[in-house]
C-alpha cells in the first residue's frame, strides 16, 4: 500500500507540475485551454474554472493540456443548418444549440445563412416575418451546445496559432522547464535538510566493508586514491568508482599523520553489465546554503547528462531496453525506494522529474521536443507546416511512442517474473 501511495503521489506531482507549466504560460499568452488533465482514459473527477475543465483520469500514463486551435474541437455549423440561438438582452448570442433544440425552449430556432465563429463572430439568418437578413453578434465566450454538452467557442485571438512564435514556444517548453525546476528544488531541499558532503572525511559504513578491512576509521581524511590526489568528497568518490572489484592504494590523514593502506573495492552494478567501485564509507554532512546550491546543481547536471548518455547508446548500437523503464518498471523501483525510506523516495522523485523533462525535449513528434521542432521550422521557413502534414507526423510519432511504451512495459513485466 505504501508503494502504491508513493507511486501515485510521485506520478501526480510530476505530471501536475509539467502540465501546469503548459497551462500557466498558455493562459498568460491569452490561449484558451479547454482541458487540463492528469492521467489518460476515462474521467474520474472534473470541475470547471475560468473556461478550463480540470480532470483526473483513470490511467497513470501522462496528462495533457488541450489548447484551442491545436486540433478541431468545435462542432461544425454551416449555412443551411437549423440551430437554436440563446440571446441576451442586447441580442448577442450566448449559446448556439446544435441539436435537441426542443430541450431549450428559450432558444430562437433559425436557419443559418452565414456564420463566423473565428474572426468576426456573427451569425446571419433570414427573419421569417420580414424576409430580411438579420445579423446577430456572437459573444467571444459563447457556448456551442451539442448532445447537451457545452463547449466555449475559440475565436482566432484565443487560438494557439494566433500568438507570436516566442509565446507559443514558451507554452510548449514550460512543461519540461517546470520539471527541471521541480527536480532542482527537491535536490536543494534534501541537501538543506540532510546537509551536504564536501570534504573527504569519512565515516565507515557497516562491518566487513572494504574500508574497514583496509584499516580505515571514522574521521580519517582521504587525500589520494591510487596516487591521484583528492581534495573533496566528489573527487574521492569519482576516483573510487573507476576501480570496481580492484585493489587500490589509499592515502589518508589521521590526527594530522599521513598514512597509506590498500583496499580491495566492492563493485556495484549501476547499469546492466556496468559497474562502479565501492569503498563502503559515508561523508560527514555540512549545513551550508552555498554548499547545498552547489550540490543541487551538480546532481542536476549529473542526472541530466546520465540520461543523455543512455540515449546516446542508441547511436552506438549499445542500447538495451533494460536501460529504460515504463510504468511497471517505475513502480518496481518505487517499491525499492520506499523500502529505503522517505528521503530515498524524494530523491527518486527528483530523478524522475529531471528524466521527464529531458525525455519530453527529445525531437520526437507527439513530445514537446517534436512540437518545438515544428515551431523552429516555422521560424526558419517563415510559415508553419500545414496542419494536415503536422497532424499526420504527430500521429505517427504518437503511435511509435505508444508502441515503445508497450514494448518497455512488456520488458518490465518479463524482468519481474524472471
Swiss-Prot record:
The keyword Transmembrane helix applies. It is found in: Cell membrane. Keywords: Cell membrane, Hydrolase, Membrane, Metal-binding, Metalloprotease, Protease, Transmembrane, Transmembrane helix, Zinc. Its EC number is 3.4.24.-. GO terms for cellular component: plasma membrane. It is a multi-pass membrane protein. Its cofactor is Zn(2+). The chain crosses the membrane at residues 5-25, 170-190, 345-365, 390-410. GO terms for biological process: proteolysis. The active site is at residue 19. SUPFAM superfamilies: PDZ domain-like. InterPro entries: PDZ, PDZ_sf, Pept_M50_Zn, Peptidase_M50. Pfam families: PDZ_2 (PF13180), Peptidase_M50 (PF02163). Residues 183-267 form the PDZ domain. Zn(2+) binds at residues 18, 22. SMART domains: PDZ. One of its GO terms (molecular function) is metalloendopeptidase activity. Belongs to the peptidase M50B family. Is responsible for Site-2 cleavage of the RsiW anti-sigma factor. This results, after a third proteolytic step catalyzed by the ClpXP protease, in the release of SigW and the transcription activation of the genes under the control of the sigma-W factor. This is Zinc metalloprotease RasP.
